[in-house]
């Protein structure tokens, strides 16, 4: 273990725990020595503080009648952070059951979106879920496993999208014969790995909100650590989604199908190294689901999130873990965009558009090429023109304009004109899905 690591493990140490002052410490973090029990209590305290609201407490009488029994959806990837959040929340429910004669302050639903094939995982989530749920008896924990293909619930929404050179986007409806795309097929049409990563985030967020709506949950919680949130701030900024930073780092509410959901990050004040230490101490790491894909060492083959993850890992290893806290505190100053006028919603990702990205891009784009000076340069120009003239374009008579945000313009840049890009387009004026269609979105405990 590096001396610069934010968590320093102590083996056979005489150092006394600075909290209880009764037993030897097992690790040092934030310049404080902790024994096992005090460190576990310290991490769990972060979640307790985040979910201190009356909604998550055991309620009686008038308060129970007014608030009712809350239902919380936990996004479980199977990674160490989501497993730690599950343990922390389930332990709270165990304490409530013990202290209140079997009563709980809220119901807990675990949701996993199956990434076994997509991420080449070392085990299926179905292998660990029964073990995980049994671990916290007598807490009654529900769990759902969704296929990523659940994202497609109305094929009539799937259209071919093309980004023009003036940054406008047009779409064309597909015939029944053409409309055979799966989610995996659509992702393969992404111009690069970062674009695929960006659109996967859109898919996951949509599936989580749909499930929360169907399951009548009021709160959605994510296991993001402080390090992960700092990572998200940088990644969103690079991907052109700066207007969404405030939603990725702070507790907030979102509207979906005319229902309001509370989004919480209970581990937002915990470093990733501390999450790993917690998992080690309570032996949660044996349940962790990991990708077997070996990340490339060549920078150009990495996604934006890979790059930002490597950046913060390097900072942790060199003694600058506090940088994550600085990034998060800076990001917290970025509230929701304040604009009186809205350009509707992006029909690809669903975010609200506050400024016309096409107009801004036209203003900053240099349209005149540098003068051609050599024969080699002229040859490249000729090849470029030939490629443009030979590429298929959508039949403009059967197309219609698409409302698209700056982040999705960045994501679609580089998509091939002959294949274009295929995606289920949303209505530009609302973030709602057709209620009749959503009613067909059936969930089971073992859906695949």
UniProtKB/Swiss-Prot annotation:
<comment type="similarity">
    <text>Belongs to the CTU2/NCS2 family.</text>
</comment>
<dbReference type="GO" id="GO:0002143">
    <property type="term" value="P:tRNA wobble position uridine thiolation"/>
</dbReference>
<dbReference type="GO" id="GO:0002098">
    <property type="term" value="P:tRNA wobble uridine modification"/>
</dbReference>
<dbReference type="GO" id="GO:0016783">
    <property type="term" value="F:sulfurtransferase activity"/>
</dbReference>
<dbReference type="GO" id="GO:0032447">
    <property type="term" value="P:protein urmylation"/>
</dbReference>
<dbReference type="GO" id="GO:0005829">
    <property type="term" value="C:cytosol"/>
</dbReference>
<comment type="function">
    <text>Plays a central role in 2-thiolation of mcm(5)S(2)U at tRNA wobble positions of tRNA(Lys), tRNA(Glu) and tRNA(Gln). May act by forming a heterodimer with NCS6 that ligates sulfur from thiocarboxylated URM1 onto the uridine of tRNAs at wobble position. Prior mcm(5) tRNA modification by the elongator complex is required for 2-thiolation. May also be involved in protein urmylation.</text>
</comment>
<dbReference type="InterPro" id="IPR014729">
    <property type="entry name" value="Rossmann-like_a/b/a_fold"/>
</dbReference>
<dbReference type="GO" id="GO:0001403">
    <property type="term" value="P:invasive growth in response to glucose limitation"/>
</dbReference>
<dbReference type="GO" id="GO:0016779">
    <property type="term" value="F:nucleotidyltransferase activity"/>
</dbReference>
<keyword id="KW-0819">tRNA processing</keyword>
<comment type="pathway">
    <text>tRNA modification; 5-methoxycarbonylmethyl-2-thiouridine-tRNA biosynthesis.</text>
</comment>
<dbReference type="GO" id="GO:0034227">
    <property type="term" value="P:tRNA thio-modification"/>
</dbReference>
<dbReference type="InterPro" id="IPR019407">
    <property type="entry name" value="CTU2"/>
</dbReference>
<protein>
    <recommendedName>
        <fullName>Cytoplasmic tRNA 2-thiolation protein 2</fullName>
    </recommendedName>
</protein>
<dbReference type="Pfam" id="PF10288">
    <property type="entry name" value="CTU2"/>
</dbReference>
<dbReference type="GO" id="GO:0007124">
    <property type="term" value="P:pseudohyphal growth"/>
</dbReference>
<keyword id="KW-0963">Cytoplasm</keyword>
<dbReference type="GO" id="GO:0000049">
    <property type="term" value="F:tRNA binding"/>
</dbReference>
């Amino acid at each position: 273990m590096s001396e610069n690591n934010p968590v320093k493990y102590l083996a056979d140490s005489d150092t006394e725990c600075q909290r209880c002052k009764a037993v030897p410490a097992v690790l040092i973090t934030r310049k404080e020595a902790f024994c096992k029990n005090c460190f576990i209590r310290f991490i769990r305290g972060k979640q307790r503080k985040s979910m201190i609201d009356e909604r998550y407490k055991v309620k009686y009488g008038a308060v129970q009648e007014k608030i009712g029994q809350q239902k919380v959806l936990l996004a479980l990837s199977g990674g160490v952070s989501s497993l730690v959040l599950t343990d922390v929340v389930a332990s709270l429910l165990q304490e409530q059951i013990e202290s209140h004669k079997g009563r709980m302050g809220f119901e807990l639903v675990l949701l996993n979106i199956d990434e076994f094939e997509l991420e080449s995982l070392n085990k299926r989530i179905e292998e660990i879920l029964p073990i995980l749920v049994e671990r916290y008896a007598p807490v009654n924990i529900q769990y759902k496993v969704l296929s990523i293909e659940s994202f497609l619930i109305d094929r009539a929404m799937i259209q071919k999208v093309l980004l023009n050179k003036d940054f406008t986007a047009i779409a064309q409806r597909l015939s029944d014969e053409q409309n055979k795309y799966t989610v995996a097929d659509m992702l393969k049409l992404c111009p690069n790995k970062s674009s695929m990563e960006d659109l996967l985030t859109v898919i996951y967020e949509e599936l989580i909100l749909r499930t929360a709506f169907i399951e009548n949950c009021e709160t959605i919680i994510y296991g993001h650590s402080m390090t992960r949130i700092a990572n998200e701030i940088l990644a969103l900024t690079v991907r052109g989604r700066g207007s969404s930073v405030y939603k990725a780092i702070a507790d907030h509410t979102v509207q979906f199908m005319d229902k309001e959901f509370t989004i919480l990050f209970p581990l937002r004040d915990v470093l990733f190294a501390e999450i790993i230490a917690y998992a080690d101490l309570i032996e949660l790491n044996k349940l962790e689901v990991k990708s077997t894909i070996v990340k490339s060492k060549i920078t150009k083959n990495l996604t934006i999130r890979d790059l930002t993850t490597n950046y913060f890992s390097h900072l942790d290893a060199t003694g600058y873990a506090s940088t994550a806290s600085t990034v998060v505190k800076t990001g917290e100053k970025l509230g929701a965009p304040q604009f009186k006028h809205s350009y509707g919603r992006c029909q690809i990702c669903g975010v609200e558009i506050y400024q016309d990205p096409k107009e801004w891009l036209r203003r900053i784009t240099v349209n005149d090429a540098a003068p051609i000076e050599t024969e080699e340069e002229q040859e490249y120009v000729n090849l470029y023109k030939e490629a443009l003239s030979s590429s298929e374009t959508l039949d403009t008579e059967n197309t219609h304009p698409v409302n698209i945000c700056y982040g999705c313009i960045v994501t679609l840049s580089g998509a091939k004109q002959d294949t274009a890009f295929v995606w289920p387009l949303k209505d530009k004026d609302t973030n709602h899905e057709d209620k009749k269609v959503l009613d067909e979105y059936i969930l089971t405990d073992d859906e695949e």
